[in-house]
Regions:
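TRAFAC-class small GTPase G-domain
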Residues: 1-187
Length: 187
């Protein structure tokens, strides 16, 4: 009898745990984004941006948004580390792809990496949030400009959104996370 009530209690009151990959080429601001999300959704200050070093392997972060627990897997974006990304695809409920919107010379590399991610069968149907990061830098292109440049044909059948954010000052972070939770809870 206890297990029946426990199961019912757990069903009614526990939060759904969702796994989100944070991907992008090196220096896009993935770890800064993760640290800013942690500080926005908790009372704990994340690592200051000037103390963040390039990710070699994986950083894990956890936050609670609405009725969900989000577990973020922030993976290193250097060319030699991108081969490990696919080891995390099968368990991912969504993907955040971060692009440094202030550095157009790296858009082609970002587009190539993103297209490879989108082709993988384990991520078919996973919601995709593409972030035009570093909006605090005057030279950054808008989310619409980035979307036109990336010109991703495969997005037609996928739930996706482009959003302009600044992982440095937090602009757009809360809206992005709330959109992601909403679409993951529906799928």
């Amino acid at each position: 009898m206890f297990s029946l009530f426990y199961g019912l209690w757990k069903y009614l009151f526990s939060k759904m745990e969702l796994h989100v990959l944070i991907l992008g080429i090196d220096k896009a601001g993935k770890t800064t984004l993760l640290e800013k999300m942690k500080s926005v959704y908790s009372n704990i200050e994340g690592i200051p941006p000037d103390r963040i070093i390039p990710t070699v392997g994986l950083n894990i972060g956890r936050i609670e948004v609405a009725n969900s627990k989000l577990v973020f897997w922030d993976l290193g974006g250097q060319p030699g580390l991108r081969s490990i990304w696919e080891k995390y695809y099968e368990e991912a409920h969504a993907v955040i792809f971060v692009v440094d919107a202030s550095c157009p010379s790296r858009f082609e590399d970002a587009k190539s990496a993103l297209e490879k991610v989108l082709r993988h069968e384990d991520l078919q149907g996973a919601p995709l949030l593409i972030l035009a990061n570093k909006q605090d830098i005057p030279e950054a292109v808008s989310a619409d400009e980035l979307a036109r440049y990336l010109d991703l044909k495969k997005l037609d059948e996928r739930v996706s959104m482009f959003e302009a954010v600044s992982a440095y000052d937090g602009m757009g972070i809360r809206e992005s996370a709330e959109w992601l939770v909403e679409v993951m809870e529906r799928s």
